[in-house]
Design a protein with these regions (language model features):
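A contiguous loop/helix-start segment that scaffolds small-molecule binding in enzyme catalytic cores
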Residues: 4, 166-235
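Short gly/pro/ser/thr-enriched loop/turn and capping motifs at secondary-structure boundaries
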Residues: 38-41, 129-132, 181-182, 205-207
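General beta-strand structural signal in soluble alpha/beta enzymes
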Residues: 33, 61, 96-98, 124-127, ...
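A polyampholytic, Gly/Pro-enriched intrinsically disordered region
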Residues: 77-86, 142-153, 216-227
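Structural motif corresponding to alpha-helix initiation and N-cap regions
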Residues: 78-81, 156-159, 181
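Class I S-adenosyl-L-methionine
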Residues: 1-14, 19-21, 26-121, 210-212, ...
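Class I SAM-dependent methyltransferase SAM-binding "motif I" and its flanking Rossmann-like core
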Residues: 103-168, 233-234
Length: 235
């Protein structure tokens, strides 16, 4: 049985790919690319494609639906684990590419136990998480001194839930803010953070955009590839 590398390719800028990730991609026999539905394409692949122009690796797309139906998802993860293991028979080297870092809301980690069940050797290669890149771009410190940091998704939460998180933590990163913009707006206002947030969308790409104005945010359609950093207003 071959070996699979789970590779974080960073948030969007191809130049933020790590040297180790680059070297593994050069030697990979197969590169596995997650996509939300068949034929939709892979943003992770768009990040690496210029780095593998001379590669002879086989590119395999794997479908990962963007919903939360547990049983259906588990079947898909198991099937993708089987597909990956089949491709790596005969001591082949594979690379499963994923946005940001594999340990942060990554399709790879959901699939990992199902790949291991087939006896495939696995190594995880870290990448730059989107919220770290966003903090750098916006020059926003994520933590200082004894402050804490919470990273949490927005998933059709009630405004009360989000407000509670903002009141309990010094620094908050909300992933997937497009999931419930209205609840997010309410929570920002109720926690008094209208002047201490930054929305960063499509970080590291040509479409990158930063929004720090609450009124502008109210009128803006937040795309899926976005995140928000919120600081304590007293800081």
């Amino acid at each position: 049985m071959g070996k699979l590398y789970g590779i974080g390719v960073g948030p969007g800028d191809p130049e933020l790919l790590t040297l180790k990730a680059y070297k593994i991609l050069q030697k990979a026999d197969v590169i596995f690319c997650p996509e939300k539905k068949k034929g939709a394409g892979s943003f992770a692949f768009d990040i690496i494609k210029e780095h593998i122009k001379d590669s002879k690796a086989r590119i395999v797309d794997l479908e990962y639906p963007m919903h939360y139906h547990g049983d259906e998802l588990k079947k898909m993860w198991q099937e993708n684990g089987r597909i990956i293991s089949e491709y790596l028979k005969g001591e082949k080297t594979g690379a499963f590419i994923t946005l940001g870092d594999p340990s942060v809301y990554s399709t790879f980690m959901y699939t990992l136990p199902y790949i291991e069940a087939f006896g495939t050797e696995i190594e995880v290669i870290p990448g730059i998480p989107s919220f770290c890149a966003a903090a750098a771009i916006s020059r926003t410190p994520l933590t200082a001194w004894d402050e804490d940091l919470l990273v949490a998704p927005v998933r059709k939460n009630s405004p009360e839930d989000l407000t509670k998180l903002l009141k309990e933590h010094d620094n908050v990163v909300f992933m997937k803010p497009s999931s419930d913009k209205e609840a997010l707006l309410t929570a920002i206002k109720e926690s008094g953070r209208e002047n201490s947030f930054v929305l960063v969308e499509k970080v590291g790409t040509k479409e990158q955009r930063l929004i720090c104005d609450y009124n502008e945010l109210k009128e803006h359609d937040i795309p899926y590839l976005s995140l928000m950093i919120l600081k304590d207003q007293k800081q």
